[in-house]
C-alpha cells in the first residue's frame, strides 16, 4: 500500500461520511477524533502491559482482551485509527501529508545525526 492511495481513499470516505463535505468539521474536531483514537491505543497498551505482568484487569465485555496477541493486535488497530484521523487532520489544514511526513522524519534524523532519510 502506498500512502497516496490511503490518503485518497480516506478523503473520499470522509467526504462521503460527511455528506460530501469533510470540511464541515474544523481542525479541532478532526484533532479531537484523532486524540480519542490515540487514547484508545493507550488503553489497549495498558491492558497489554497488565497481561504481560499477569496483573488482573476488569473490563467491559466488549473491551476484554484475554491474550497478549489480542492486546497487541488491538494496540495496532487503534494506532491505525489514529493514523487515519491524523491524515484527515493534515488534509483539513491543507498540507500535503507526504511532504510534511518526509520533512519531519528527515529533520528528526538530522537533529540526532541518524543517516535514515526518506
Specify the residue positions occupied by each region the protein language model found:
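Flexible "arm" and connector segments at domain edges
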Residues: 1-118
Amino acid at each position: 500500500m502506498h500512502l497516496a492511495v490511503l490518503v485518497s481513499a480516506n478523503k473520499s470516505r470522509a467526504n462521503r461520511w460527511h455528506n460530501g463535505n469533510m470540511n464541515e468539521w474544523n481542525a479541532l474536531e478532526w484533532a479531537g477524533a484523532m486524540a480519542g483514537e490515540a487514547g484508545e491505543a493507550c488503553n489497549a497498551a495498558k491492558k497489554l502491559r497488565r497481561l504481560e505482568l499477569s496483573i488482573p484487569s476488569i473490563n467491559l465485555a466488549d473491551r476484554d482482551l484475554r491474550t497478549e496477541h489480542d492486546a497487541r493486535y488491538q494496540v495496532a488497530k487503534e494506532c491505525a485509527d489514529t493514523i487515519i484521523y491524523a491524515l484527515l487532520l493534515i488534509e483539513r489544514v491543507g498540507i500535503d501529508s507526504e511532504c510534511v511526513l518526509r520533512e519531519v522524519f528527515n529533520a528528526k534524523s538530522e537533529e540526532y545525526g541518524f543517516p535514515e532519510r526518506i
